[in-house]
Amino acid sequence: LKASVSIEVVEKMPWEGSGTQDDPYRIATAEDLVALSDYVNAKKVSKDLYFAMTANIDLGELSSWTPIGSNSSRQFQGTFDGQGHTIDNLRSVSGGLFGYVGVYATIQNVGVASGEIGSPNSYASFFGAIAKWSNGADFINCWNGADVYGGGYTGGIVGTIRDGGKSTISGCYNVGN
């Protein structure tokens, strides 16, 4: 007599919600945002996952922010909806709220209200408050009020678009320096 058992291993996520469009993972605190950065930067797949901010988030307690999607092999590819909320005191010398954002990603309805991205003496490339680098992502109704510094590809919203212009930026604006 032989028996076969099938086991499905489901990773426990640190956020409330199920990550679907109807029940996105909820980002309510700085700790939740750090957990998202850690998750994507550990090469976890974010494609087809949905995240929604449920409150304004102050990153003032962090000495420096590590962007979500720290390099081109760790791109964020999900949907992040700020729902009109803001990020305050974002300080990063390696990108913006997001680092590398890839095909399939949508970043929407979020503002970086204050902070410093890059440094006044920086000659490095790729700085943007919402994302430093995009490869086919959509940015909708995002805004920036932080100071963004860089010597190469630097922008208030996105530092560079590396996909032949297939990314879209719609309804976004910059009031930062």
Could you say what each language-model-derived stretch is?
Residues 1-5:
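Extracellular and select intracellular beta-sandwich modules with Ser/Thr-enriched
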Residues 9-177:
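Surface-exposed repetitive/solenoidal architectures
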